[in-house]
């Protein structure tokens, strides 16, 4: 009986110590459909763009490749939680839901993926993004 409990405890601890998957390598990011990209883009255009285009108020700018690469290593769960609850960073504050209080959880989820999608496109093209 003690062996079983010890075995279950070890499995539990292994499961808890998983390192986050880099967003750029996550299956969800790689499998985003056009509909999901458009959903994320709509939140970007109406809410995220104001701060994350140029780093206003200390926000991470999609033009800062090194910063986005560092953020990507935190994994989706931590970044999504920061969006939902808000956060205080080194250079500024992001309010809960990035001020998109009418956004659904799904819209916010794809806005996180979209901003990394956009940052990737910006880095590949070496051009500034547009809001369409």
Task: Provide a role label for each language-model segment.
Residues 2-37, 114-132:
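Post-cleavage N-terminal segment of exported redox proteins
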Residues 10, 42-45, 88, 97:
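Processing junctions and N-termini across compartments
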Residues 20-42, 57-70:
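Electrostatic cytochrome c docking/interface patches
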Residues 16, 48-51, 100-103:
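Disulfide-bonded cysteines in secreted/extracellular proteins and peptides
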Residues 44-54, 83, 111-115:
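The canonical Cys-X-X-Cys-His
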